[in-house]
Amino acid sequence: MKTKILNLANEEIGEISLNEDIFAVEFIRDDIIKQVVDWQRAKAMAGTHKTKTVSEVSGTTKKPFKQKGTGNARQGSLRSVQMRGGGVIHGPVVRSHATKLPKKVRKLGLIHALSEKFSEGKLLVIDSLKLETPKTSNLVNILNKFQGKSFFVIDGNEVDVNFSLAAQNIYNTVVVPQIGANVYDIIRHEYVLLSQEAVNVLEERLK
């Protein structure tokens, strides 16, 4: 399967053959894509939420008032869960939200996400993702030629330093080497831009 190669001016300069088993899967498995996205988002959660239990709340352990004769319900501690400023029962604790997902499923998710973008006509192959200077304004002008609202840019094994620096302050634009290609960023950005080197490395990695 062939597709056109563009330059950074959005001009066609040639053709490249793409592996249909990676970029043109016939039946897109949205369920697999969702599984991988859920796995990614769970793994990214900090898990630093925490409330204090009765034993952790600061305060006295003295009985607030005598057992009998006050007309109030008996109380043993001001740190009890029913007291204002007391502990929290069954509250969140610091933990990892990460789950396990087989490598084959993760690989399938990436293949189906790339195929979905290609079927929409929003996966573009660029001859080279290199800039002479790290000027954000220059890169903004380049991306405007593709008429997209958001871009996920995937380069080869290494990202051009000037391109990476220029993209840092551009809203909804993420630049990664091929090892950083992931399902969540592919589906949440409107366009995916792949360098020729990225295509070759991804085909080798996902075959």
From Swiss-Prot:
GO terms for molecular function: rRNA binding; structural constituent of ribosome. InterPro entries: Ribosomal_uL4 (IPR002136), Ribosomal_uL4-like (IPR013005), Ribosomal_uL4_dom_sf (IPR023574). Residues 53-76 are annotated as: Disordered. Pfam families: Ribosomal_L4 (PF00573). SUPFAM superfamilies: Ribosomal protein L4. GO terms for cellular component: ribonucleoprotein complex; ribosome. Keywords: Ribonucleoprotein, Ribosomal protein, RNA-binding, rRNA-binding. Disulfide bonds: none annotated. GO terms for biological process: translation. One of the primary rRNA binding proteins, this protein initially binds near the 5'-end of the 23S rRNA. It is important during the early stages of 50S assembly. It makes multiple contacts with different domains of the 23S rRNA in the assembled 50S subunit and ribosome. Forms part of the polypeptide exit tunnel. Belongs to the universal ribosomal protein uL4 family. Part of the 50S ribosomal subunit. This is Large ribosomal subunit protein uL4.
